[in-house]
Curated annotation (Swiss-Prot):
<protein>
    <recommendedName>
        <fullName>HTH-type transcriptional regulator NsrR</fullName>
    </recommendedName>
</protein>
<keyword id="KW-0804">Transcription</keyword>
<keyword id="KW-0411">Iron-sulfur</keyword>
<keyword id="KW-0408">Iron</keyword>
<keyword id="KW-0479">Metal-binding</keyword>
<keyword id="KW-0001">2Fe-2S</keyword>
<dbReference type="GO" id="GO:0003700">
    <property type="term" value="F:DNA-binding transcription factor activity"/>
</dbReference>
<feature type="binding site">
    <location>
        <position position="100"/>
    </location>
    <ligand>
        <name>[2Fe-2S] cluster</name>
    </ligand>
</feature>
<feature type="binding site">
    <location>
        <position position="106"/>
    </location>
    <ligand>
        <name>[2Fe-2S] cluster</name>
    </ligand>
</feature>
<dbReference type="InterPro" id="IPR036388">
    <property type="entry name" value="WH-like_DNA-bd_sf"/>
</dbReference>
<keyword id="KW-0805">Transcription regulation</keyword>
<feature type="domain" description="HTH rrf2-type">
    <location>
        <begin position="2"/>
        <end position="133"/>
    </location>
</feature>
<dbReference type="GO" id="GO:0046872">
    <property type="term" value="F:metal ion binding"/>
</dbReference>
<dbReference type="GO" id="GO:0005829">
    <property type="term" value="C:cytosol"/>
</dbReference>
<dbReference type="GO" id="GO:0051537">
    <property type="term" value="F:2 iron, 2 sulfur cluster binding"/>
</dbReference>
<comment type="function">
    <text>Nitric oxide-responsive transcriptional regulator.</text>
</comment>
<feature type="DNA-binding region" description="H-T-H motif">
    <location>
        <begin position="28"/>
        <end position="51"/>
    </location>
</feature>
């Protein structure tokens, strides 16, 4: 299963913010530049993560963004489920658009559903804090430490 760039950027933004001092504000432009990703796309991601209560956005001249929750309170599986617009691996997962003639007897759908459930279950075992065990290396790569 491949995550969308939207989810990828969401996770990267959360990781970046988790590496910052608790009260430090970052800018979307700064994060987009560091990751070499679209500012406009990251702005949409930022807006959505704010609506989900994962990041805090402060408007104004001295505004910026920061985590709204502690890293240990942000579950990776939950973020993926909230930011992926479609977790249907195959057409038959959607009863409204399914046109596969094998559907009544197909066993593949069950196997794929089991695989998706296992995939999400693994992601749900981790929090943002779990991704920070190599904090020094991450900060060096993101040029957060001199």
């Amino acid at each position: 299963m491949q995550l969308t760039s939207y989810t990828d950027y969401s996770l990267r933004l959360l990781l970046y913010l988790a590496l910052q001092p608790k009260d430090k504000l970052s800018s979307v432009k700064q994060v987009a530049t560091i990751y070499n990703i679209s500012y406009n796309h990251l702005t949409k991601v930022t807006y959505e993560l704010g609506k989900l209560g994962l990041i805090e956005t402060i408007k104004g001249r001295n505004g910026g963004i920061r985590l709204a929750k502690a890293p240990e309170e942000i579950n990776i599986g939950a973020v993926v489920k909230q930011t992926e617009d479609n977790l249907e691996l195959v057409e038959c997962f959607n009863h409204e658009t399914n046109t596969c003639i094998l559907n009544p007897v197909c066993r593949l759908k069950g196997v794929l559903h089991e695989a998706l459930t296992a995939y999400l279950r693994v992601l749900e075992q981790y929090t943002l804090k779990d991704l920070l065990t190599n904090e020094d290396e991450l900060q060096a790569l993101l040029k957060l430490k001199p």
